[in-house]
Amino acid sequence: MVKVIASSVRKGNVLDVDGKLYVVLTAQNFHPGKGTPVTQVDMRRIVDGVKVSERWRTTEQVERAFVEDVNFQYLYEDGEGFHFMNPATYDQVVVSAETMGDQKAYLQEGMTCILSIHEGVPLALELPRHVTLEIVETEPVVKGQTASSSYKPAMLSNGIRTSVPPHIDAGTRVVIATEDNSYVERAKD
């Protein structure tokens, strides 16, 4: 365990709070005009999946658990969960749907992800920053819309809704940011 200041806690970190391990879902630093700055952290308890919200002064010490980040390749999903393989050792691990959370929509066969492992147990998954998906449905462009900062709703092949520029039509492959589901660019493939 390593002690760190609360303001350095980031999404995906594993914290030891009162002897229990938690995965950080969100971490935000607030600096009110009056008073001391605080860090608001939403976490999920690893043992039972209970979500907890904590607020610490930014200078408070919290314990970060030792977690090994290892590259794994996504293989497939079945009734047990999501199967990943370590390309260096060919070891396979199964990650539960609860651990995956909303990120499972972006998984593609053969995709390389980073799994955070603590004592042999996968705790969290980090996807690539960008993924390429196909647009399956968009609304038609309204006449008179200009190209400047006007976006239209679109449905991606993984079922997630996003906003795309007016020149993007159904069937177009686009690059999407996995962190916030936002359009990045048209795919170059």
UniProtKB/Swiss-Prot annotation:
The cellular location(s) given in this protein's UniProt record come to: Cytoplasm
Q: Its principal location? A: cytoplasm
Which one GO biological process term can you cite for this protein? peptide biosynthetic process
**What are the entry keywords?**
Cytoplasm, Elongation factor, Protein biosynthesis
Q: Which family does it belong to?
A: Belongs to the elongation factor P family.
User: PANTHER family given for it?
Assistant: ELONGATION FACTOR P (PTHR30053), TRANSLATION ELONGATION FACTOR KOW-LIKE DOMAIN-CONTAINING PROTEIN (PTHR30053:SF14)
Q: Which HAMAP family match?
A: EF_P
- The protein's name is Elongation factor P
